[in-house]
From Swiss-Prot:
It comes from the Bacteria. RNaseP catalyzes the removal of the 5'-leader sequence from pre-tRNA to produce the mature 5'-terminus. It can also cleave other RNA substrates such as 4.5S RNA. The protein component plays an auxiliary but essential role in vivo by binding to the 5'-leader sequence and broadening the substrate specificity of the ribozyme. It catalyses: Endonucleolytic cleavage of RNA, removing 5'-extranucleotides from tRNA precursor. Pfam families: Ribonuclease_P. GO terms for biological process: tRNA 5'-leader removal. It comes from Buchnera aphidicola subsp. Acyrthosiphon pisum (strain APS) (Acyrthosiphon pisum symbiotic bacterium). GO terms for molecular function: 3'-tRNA processing endoribonuclease activity; ribonuclease P activity; tRNA binding. This is Ribonuclease P protein component. Keywords: Endonuclease, Hydrolase, Nuclease, RNA-binding, tRNA processing.
Amino acid sequence: MLNYFFKKQLRLSDSTSFQDVFNGSVKKKNTLEISILGRFNLLGHPRLGLSIPRKNIKHAHNRNLIKRLVRETFRLLQYKLLSMDFVVIAKKNILFLNNTRIIDMLNSLWSNYYR
């Protein structure tokens, strides 16, 4: 039975990991609302980092909502994804979408990284 927890080992925790993804991203998928950068790792499981700039999304409750939605879609799809480090970057236009549209868009973006 698969366990769908979002453990600490599935997170990008330090700045060097983020910089490695920003500088050496192999796969980039963009929409007007979100970008996902990906870089292969040797860990055998995917890891997620979030970049939700305060400059783009002013209110903390909106930033937290976006983070929750991204983490939830990642958590549910973690066993389908390639062994990569991902950084998700939110853009201003994401505020104009409702939750179901954001989830659908994230699922379609994650599908580009399936095994």
